[in-house]
């Protein structure tokens, strides 16, 4: 949708204060939304790509040129409380969806060419602790995100996965997925 309407800016209502700022009003410790905004800032570039798919209304998908390197970054948001999804990215970012219980192997495409699967993609899966979307603790790839002993933001390390394998997205979670060197014409 952002691509269709030429949206160029993401704006957050409050950094601190209001009903729910990115930082806690008293401690200035990041609230869970801070980490999704930080990953967006680090991974999603200015070039917005169009994604068309038919599937569940509980799954949202957004694609951008990657921010600091060649490739494409995708954000997947699963709004379902009970259903996980498997997403396969194929030629020119056509996305096929299937429920997790119906995993099937498909020919994988990497940009505009068939890919042999030797390269890896980066996955950043964010969810609430114990699957609770109201949790004050955000998990990155299953690990709690907490400030370091020095009060610094923790390292946000991805899981590396075979580029041609399906992306699994759990209920009530989001995933940033970076496909390095993906050959999207709009990102050249």
Could you say what each language-model-derived stretch is?
Residues 1-188:
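Substrate-binding and catalytic surfaces of secreted/luminal carbohydrate-active proteins
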